[in-house]
Amino acid sequence: MELYAASHSLPNYPSSFLFKPKITTFHTTLFPTKFAPFKASFFSPNHLTLTTPMNPPTTSLSSAAFVEHNNGSTSTSLPFHPETRVGEVKRVTKETNVSVKINLDGSGVADSSTGIPFLDHMLDQLASHGLFDVHVKATGDVHIDDHHTNEDVALAIGTALLQALGDRKGINRFGDFSAPLDEALIHVSLDLSGRPHLSYNLDIPTQRVGTYDTQVVEHFLQSIVNTSGMTLHIRQLAGRNSHHIIEATFKAFARALRQATEYDPRRRGSVPSSKGVLSRS
């Protein structure tokens, strides 16, 4: 990113004052209010250039060196993550043809067409509430039932997550969220540990929601767990409506996964494990 400060907009303060900027927060004020206004242009997420009367345009600060100076104290204040984490998978069998692309650092874009309308609706929840960009295209033998397409979409999503996470350096690793939807309340807790495990406790009262077989909800989640290598616990705390129970589950899962995949700036890019490595078991 580059920040340009117009020289005519800056008062003539003593150099001793100008050399001690106090950077308070990236999203609101980068300099004391007496320095405003200034023009800002953003180009790169991990690199910035500050241009002031004392800093010619060639002066640049990397994200690792961007610190706050306040009464002699120095601390890293702005975590930058230059690499977009994307996983892309194509899975083809005699039963299905599935393409999945996931951007963990997206904005919630959903583009899903699986031939199973209710599953598309749930994938929209994953994108919207996880702020992931989720693109899923699938064709399959839905004339038989939803089972094969449901399973293979989930297997591909889990593999795409595994790709996108990479070495998992700097992430939170753990996620925990409870989502209400009217009378339904679902709690999800997960660990991107590399060890696949599903603990599933949903009591869905009807066999179908629309044409969607509710028995395959557990199978969908188990398939994601198997290929992504996550530990996933799901608990139903309340709920009577099948649609609400399932949708609250996907919303809670999306928010917990968002927490787990986001960066922890205090880790400074280290692997969140005492072993020093997180890999698919």
Curated annotation (Swiss-Prot):
Signal sequence bounds: none
Keyword Lyase: yes
Keywords for the protein's UniProt record, in alphabetical order: Amino-acid biosynthesis, Chloroplast, Histidine biosynthesis, Lyase, Manganese, Metal-binding, Plastid, Transit peptide
Cofactor descriptive note: Binds 2 manganese ions per subunit.
Gene Ontology biological process terms from the UniProt entry: L-histidine biosynthetic process
Cofactor: Mn(2+)
Residues binding substrate, per UniProt: 95, 121-129, 147-151, 173, 195, 243-251, 273-275
Coiled coil: none
UniProt EC number: 4.2.1.19
Any GO molecular function: metal ion binding
Subcellular location: Plastid, Chloroplast
Stretch forming the transit peptide: 1-85
Binding site for Mn(2+) 1: H121, H148, H243, E247
Residues at which Mn(2+) 2 binds: H147, E151, H219, H244
Pathway: Amino-acid biosynthesis; L-histidine biosynthesis; L-histidine from 5-phospho-alpha-D-ribose 1-diphosphate: step 6/9
Family: Belongs to the imidazoleglycerol-phosphate dehydratase family.
Protein name per UniProt: Imidazoleglycerol-phosphate dehydratase, chloroplastic
Organism (species): Pisum sativum (Garden pea)
Gene from which this protein is expressed: HIS3
